[in-house]
From Swiss-Prot:
This is 1-deoxy-D-xylulose 5-phosphate reductoisomerase. It catalyses: 2-C-methyl-D-erythritol 4-phosphate + NADP(+) = 1-deoxy-D-xylulose 5-phosphate + NADPH + H(+). Pfam families: DXP_redisom_C (PF08436), DXP_reductoisom (PF02670), DXPR_C (PF13288). The keyword Manganese applies. HAMAP family: DXP_reductoisom (MF_00183). GO terms for molecular function: 1-deoxy-D-xylulose-5-phosphate reductoisomerase activity; manganese ion binding; NADPH binding. The gene is dxr. Mn(2+) binds at D150, E152, E221. SUPFAM superfamilies: 1-deoxy-D-xylulose-5-phosphate reductoisomerase, C-terminal domain, Glyceraldehyde-3-phosphate dehydrogenase-like, C-terminal domain, NAD(P)-binding Rossmann-fold domains. Its cofactor is Mg(2+); Mn(2+). 1-deoxy-D-xylulose 5-phosphate binds at K125, S151, E152, S176, H199, S212, N217, K218, E221.
């Protein structure tokens, strides 16, 4: 039985991971849980899965959490704040830590888990995008496994099983196109938050659903794929695949193309990250190609999705620039969700901030450099919002 700690237990990734644990009680057990601020849900999870340790990031919610499980015996260790989440990530006998926290907030818990010798089921792409210069050397130093748990990188990882490293020629990341794949560019000026949250295929959290609408999600995945699989950016391609049945593809040196297919269900990549190298029988709906029907593909519209181009440029710039891109995107999306900026302001804010970082880009950033760049970028987005009257795009990193 594999012991698991789950960081980000009340979010979309967390609840789907716990669904897997519920279905396979002989395969997996929960050692630790950490969540953001949802006391009621975390308390219910503690009651059901009986972890040895749990943490809530919002320190003011700790008394309420203690009260909610006061009758439990034995009591788990209860912690709060960022330090508490980090302690959960490194705690005890967990073999694998699932990182389901949204955004760069997952970086420090992931580092703590790696340093404690835990394998990582990586569902938090921002950790690697911002922190790869620190995270990857630590993975090698401590001899842990870094297993992708999001659909696209899991698909690539699955396709690569048995393929020699020298055999990989190209990666093709599929994208649904998000909420606006069939909209004319001119309509994007009138996008509402409700519009952006209507993903056609996947059930995800609010932030990642907006990222899908801007295609920043796919741009970030390009950077993640570069770090995970070692390909140059010119050999990583995005293709729009509206049905979300093919989760990604690889092209080999002899022009053979391998793909991983399945219904759009995040539990599949999560289960594989937890069970690898084994395959566990499930009773989930099996893919019926006749039912799926036509599988279509098209090139992404670069005018509609400027965030995609930004991500490629930032990835090639390297250093601390990806941390700035990620933080600026998180801040801009948060402002959009709070209806403080418009949808089209998201890429403009990000581009403005990345441009201002070019002269300060650190080629080999330390953890302190990355955290400082993250903090700086979030503040700069607020400055950028004051300059949004300029009608044209502000800068070009290319």
């Amino acid at each position: 039985m594999k012991a698991i700690t789950l960081v980000g237990s009340t979010g979309s990734i967390g609840t789907q991971t716990l669904d897997i644990v519920t279905q396979y009680p002989d395969q997996f057990r929960i050692v630790g849980l950490a969540a953001g601020n949802n006391v009621e849900m975390l308390a219910a999870q503690i009651r059901q899965f009986r972890p040895k340790i749990a943490a809530i990031c919002s320190e003011d919610k700790l008394p309420a959490l203690k009260e909610a499980i006061i009758d439990l015996d034995p009591q788990p260790i209860l912690l709060a704040g960022e330090a508490g989440v980090i302690e959960v990530a490194r705690y005890g006998d967990a073999q694998t830590v699932v990182t389901g926290i949204v955004g760069c907030a997952g970086l420090l818990p992931t580092i703590a888990a790696i340093e404690a010798g835990k394998d990582i089921a990586l569902a938090n792409k921002e950790t690697l995008i911002a922190g790869a210069p620190v995270v990857l050397p630590l993975v090698e130093k401590h001899g842990v496994k870094l297993l992708p748990a999001d659909s696209e990188h899991s698909a690539i990882f699955q396709c690569l099983q048995g393929v020699p490293k020298s055999g990989l020629r190209k990666i093709l990341l599929t994208a649904s196109g998000g909420a606006f794949r069939d909209w004319d560019v001119e309509r994007l000026a009138d996008v509402t938050v409700a519009d952006a949250l209507k993903h056609p295929n996947w059930s995800m959290g609010r932030k990642i659903t907006v990222d899908s609408a801007t295609l920043m999600n796919k741009g970030l995945e390009v950077i993640e794929a570069h770090f995970l699989f070692g390909l140059d950016y010119d050999n990583i391609e995005i293709v729009i695949h509206p049905q979300s049945i093919i989760h990604s593809l690889i092209e080999l040196q002899d022009t053979s193309v391998l793909a991983q297919l399945g219904w759009p269900d995040m539990r599949l990549p999560l289960l594989y990250a937890l069970s690898w190298p084994d395959r566990i029988y499930t009773d989930w709906e099996r893919l019926d190609l006749v039912k799926a029907g036509n599988l279509t593909f098209r090139e992404p519209d670069h005018q509609k999705y400027p965030c995609m181009q930004l991500a490629y440029a930032v990835g090639k710039a390297g250093g601390s620039m990806p941390a700035v891109l990620n933080a600026a995107n998180e801040q801009a999306v948060a402002l959009f969700l709070d209806e403080k900026i418009r949808f089209l302001d998201i890429p403009r804010c990000i581009e403005w901030v990345c441009d201002r970082h070019q002269n300060d880009n650190r080629a080999n950033p330390s953890l302190d450099d990355i955290l400082a760049a993250d903090k700086w970028a979030r503040q700069e987005v607020l400055t950028a919002t004051e300059k949004l009257e300029t009608p044209s795009r502000i800068i070009s990193l290319r």
